[in-house]
Amino acid sequence: MCRLIDDIAAFLEVNGFECSRQMRHDFDVICTKTLDGRYSRIIMPLEITARSREEAGLGSEEASYAIRMITSDSGYPLIITEDRWKRQRKMMEARLLAHLEVFSQAYARNCEVRRIDKTEAKAFLAGNHSYGYAACRYCYGLFLKRHTGHIAEETSDFGDIGKMIAVATFSNARKWVKDGKEIRSYEWTRYASLPEMRVSGGMGKLLKTFIKEVQPDDIMSYADLEWSEGEVYRALGFEAEMEKEAVDFVIDGETWERSPIRSGKEGNLFFRNFGSRKFRMKLTDYK
């Protein structure tokens, strides 16, 4: 059976990347550079072999330590877990290439935001977000309006004028009273773009539309530490608030479907993720 690291390295090499394998803090990683040689990247494949929650917890602790050490040396690694790679292969390949600067560029100024229904949001997120759809109240799509200043061709499958290239969803309001004033807080539940496309300014444009239409007092969201440290939220004006504990998952070793333990679904493998970081944007002054 082909090891995960072998499979990922073979994919990269077919796409023109030179790969070297190293042992970093007891984990096999792939070291590569963008095709232009300007940026180095560390890719950290994580095979899923734990047969119990306890074993998964120990593995998560060891991986978390390695991630912290690698980050201090070389920046946050791109973590690719075995279940994601095997169940969502096409999306993961495109996301991997995008991290290595192989993507089609679109700019928010060439796009328009429209409200979409939950059916449209669910279909898009199922194919382009690692966790798929989540319950929400407000759904927005980002649609390509014109081709200027980016490399997407009008004949490309993802560059068609009018095509939806990103989606953002938000919850209904959670309300509380502070100093006699009602505060309406919303969660930004999902954001995803087509994995092979980088939409410069896309998150910001969707967020600004939501703020303009709904006029929230407060917006919060979570950065999944399996993917990033959440720097994009800081760039948008959010502030980090707290760390959320890791979540235990059960995984079906045949389909590679990942489900939270609390879902009651069965599986023969276990995985504990790396938790998440909570971010908040206050749009009303309160303590």
PLM region descriptions:
Residues 222-286:
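Active-site/acyl-donor-binding loops of N-acyltransferases
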Residues 55-88:
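Catalytic cores of nucleic-acid endonucleases
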Residues 219:
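Flexible loop/N-cap segments at domain edges
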Residues 91, 95, 100-215, 223-231, ...:
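A conserved beta-strand-loop-helix scaffold within acyl/acetyltransferase catalytic domains
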Residues 23-46, 139:
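Short acidic loop-to-beta-strand element that houses the catalytic metal-binding Asp/Glu
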Residues 22-25, 132-136, 161, 270-274:
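A short catalytic or substrate-binding loop motif that flags glycine-/basic-rich loops and adjacent residues
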Residues 1-22:
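Acidic-basic catalytic patches of nuclease active cores, encompassing PD-(D/E)XK
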Residues 35-62, 173-175, 242:
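Short beta-strand-loop-alpha-helix junction that forms the active-site gateway
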